[in-house]
Amino acid sequence: MHDIRAIRENPAAFDAALARRGEAPMSQAILALDTARRAKINAAENAQAEQNKASKEVGQAKAQGDEATFEKLRALVSEKKALVAEMQADAKALDAELTEKLSWIANIPADDVPDGADEDDNVEVRRWGHLPDFEFTPKEHYEIGGVAASMDFDTAAKTSGARFVMLKGAVARIHRALSQFMIDTHVDHNGLTEINSPVLVRDDAMYGTDKLPKFAEDSYQTTNGWWLVSTSEIPLTYTVAGDILDAAALPIRLTAHTLCFRSEAGSAGRDTAGMLRQHQFEKVEMVSITEPDQSEAEQQRMLRCAEDILERLGLPYRTVLLCTGDMGFGARRTFDIEAWLPGQNNYREISSVSTTGDFQARRMNARYKPADGGKPQFVHTLNGSGLAVGRCLIAVLENGQQADGSVVLPPVLAGYLGGKTVLSAEGTLV
């Protein structure tokens, strides 16, 4: 949510920031609503003052036995009372209209975010690792000999439809090992607190984390009104909704491994083969709650936490800074980490690490008490994938594939796989 005071103070800067995202100016329409709302509030306050004055004079007239003045003042009190109610109702309606308009407007990009239209304008920050040099044409994950029988799309389609998969046997175990490895690394090495969170959330949690109203069509809602989370960013971030935190308690660093659900409403025809884009998938999420002056450093810390997972797995990747046209709705700045997929001969997103500034905090009224004793301020919230488990599985399988259809697995997973380090061409761990 945007700070209406900032828009009042510098509407040109607000419109310029929207223009960087390719949006039309909106300050004039917003401020017209704001002015009308404030006028109604002032009218209600003035009418209330007049009502209070008349109420006091009613008593005086009654005590003096002045019935004519008493009746006149009593009628005035009723008139002002009705006017107060009318003005307050009008102000409430205008406030709701203003809030609705603001809730559809994307976050303001940070100054260092590159301007651009789409992913072609993103800026590469760094690369890590050597791309594997195969003496054969590498296959996509679902075509690899040891994988094909354990990645069952047909049975999943029979039970659930398109964009679902049933992982079986050794591949299911590798998938589970990856999620455990990620959580253990974040808790034991990165100092995050593990949370086992709900995956069903209320409207307030979706709104507070900027998923409503913008992304209603991309999400699944149950018949009794709960929403299935598209990311555990939602329940993790919303843990501080309505709170006033002590500065000494910050930063708060959380992680969770959950199922996630997305309708992929805008992805028709994209990545239809394999398990790269699914309606149901698993992800390990990181969330940080910080003081404003710490959020930029915290974003870099979270980025390194995500990159470290890939480095421990030995998976080549590149990190890119997203341009204004490719950045998500709630983000002020986003870094994407893209893992190398030999089967596609391309880097594909495996993590996004974003800072939202106080955009989400304003929506959910999450604040902290500064150490100097000043008035409560809004916290900053950050989120990042650490990592998308299914996409990490794809990267492990494609980068480790061998000519005979087997897959050499990252050594760091051996402890989760009973000491086994290879997925055989027959689909067993050896």
UniProtKB/Swiss-Prot annotation:
L-serine binds at residues 231-233, 285, 385. Its main location: cytoplasm. Homodimer. The tRNA molecule binds across the dimer. It is found in: Cytoplasm. It holds the Pfam family tRNA-synt_2b. InterPro entries: aa-tRNA-synt_IIb, aa-tRNA-synth_II, aa-tRNA-synth_II/BPL/LPL, Ser-tRNA-ligase_type_1, Ser-tRNA-synth_1_N, SerRS_1_N_sf, SerRS_core, tRNA-bd_arm. It is an enzyme of class 6 (ligase). It catalyses: tRNA(Ser) + L-serine + ATP = L-seryl-tRNA(Ser) + AMP + diphosphate + H(+); tRNA(Sec) + L-serine + ATP = L-seryl-tRNA(Sec) + AMP + diphosphate + H(+). GO terms for molecular function: ATP binding; serine-tRNA ligase activity. Gene3D superfamilies: Bira Bifunctional Protein, Domain 2, Serine-tRNA synthetase, tRNA binding domain. PROSITE patterns: AA_TRNA_LIGASE_II. One of its GO terms (biological process) is seryl-tRNA aminoacylation. ATP binds at residues 262-264, 349-352. GO terms for cellular component: cytoplasm. Catalyzes the attachment of serine to tRNA(Ser). Is also able to aminoacylate tRNA(Sec) with serine, to form the misacylated tRNA L-seryl-tRNA(Sec), which will be further converted into selenocysteinyl-tRNA(Sec). Consists of two distinct domains, a catalytic core and a N-terminal extension that is involved in tRNA binding. SUPFAM superfamilies: Class II aaRS and biotin synthetases, tRNA-binding arm. Its EC number is 6.1.1.11. Belongs to the class-II aminoacyl-tRNA synthetase family. Type-1 seryl-tRNA synthetase subfamily. HAMAP family: Ser_tRNA_synth_type1. Pathway: Aminoacyl-tRNA biosynthesis; selenocysteinyl-tRNA(Sec) biosynthesis; L-seryl-tRNA(Sec) from L-serine and tRNA(Sec): step 1/1. Keywords: Aminoacyl-tRNA synthetase, ATP-binding, Cytoplasm, Ligase, Nucleotide-binding, Protein biosynthesis. This is Serine--tRNA ligase.
